[in-house]
């Protein structure tokens, strides 16, 4: 039981950090084009420019905290690559956490194949939706959908849905 509790705490902490990281990356990527010569500025100048813009813009409920300062060392391409890397690493880490929790809760590893299939299907769906949006020149609309799908996979949502489903299936089969 202690291990389950530890995994849940780790998942919550990692979830908050990866979300803060991606929000900061997105905020910089979205606002940098509004600042002349942004990527030519040094780290402190980038930070000051973004923060000055944040204080003059309407309140952003999604990004109401200061960005992670170490991100200002990166250029646009590095930020884009980091965003994708964080997405893939988070998917993998949360798959391992969800798989570990299911293994501990169920006591067998047969459910892990099903969980892997669920992750594969929904990850493929999310990236297909995003790709179609890019091809149809409407990436903002499809990004929001794919972000919600991958966001659910980068959390404890899979185990919160899958484990009760497994328990109900066992009860119905007995």
Give the location of each predicted region.
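Aromatic-anchored segments of alpha-helical transmembrane domains
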Residues: 9-15, 122-132
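Juxtamembrane "helix-exit" motif on the non-cytosolic side of transmembrane helices
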Residues: 104-106, 130-142
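Hydrophobic cores of alpha-helical transmembrane segments in multi-pass inner/ER membrane proteins
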Residues: 96-97, 154-168
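Membrane-interface helix-boundary motifs at transmembrane edges
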Residues: 103-114, 171-174
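Non-cytosolic membrane-interface motifs at loop->transmembrane helix junctions
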Residues: 140-153
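Individual transmembrane alpha-helix segments
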Residues: 57-94
């Amino acid at each position: 039981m202690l291990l389950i509790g530890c995994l849940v705490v780790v998942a919550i902490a990692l979830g908050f950090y990866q979300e803060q990281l991606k929000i900061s990356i997105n905020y910089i990527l979205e606002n940098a084009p509004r600042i002349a010569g942004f990527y030519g500025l040094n780290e402190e100048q980038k930070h000051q420019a973004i923060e000055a813009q944040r204080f003059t813009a309407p309140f952003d409920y999604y990004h109401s905290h200061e960005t992670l300062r170490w991100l200002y060392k990166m250029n646009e391409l590095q930020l884009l690559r980091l965003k994708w890397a964080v997405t893939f690493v988070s998917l993998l880490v949360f798959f391992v956490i969800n798989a570990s929790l299911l293994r501990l809760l169920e006591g067998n590893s047969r459910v892990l194949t099903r969980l892997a299939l669920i992750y594969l299907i929904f990850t493929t769906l999310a990236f297909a939706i995003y790709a179609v949006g890019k091809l149809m020149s409407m990436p903002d609309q499809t990004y929001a959908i794919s972000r919600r799908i991958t966001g659910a996979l980068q959390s404890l949502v899979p185990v919160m849905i899958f484990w009760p489903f497994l328990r109900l299936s066992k009860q119905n089969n007995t």
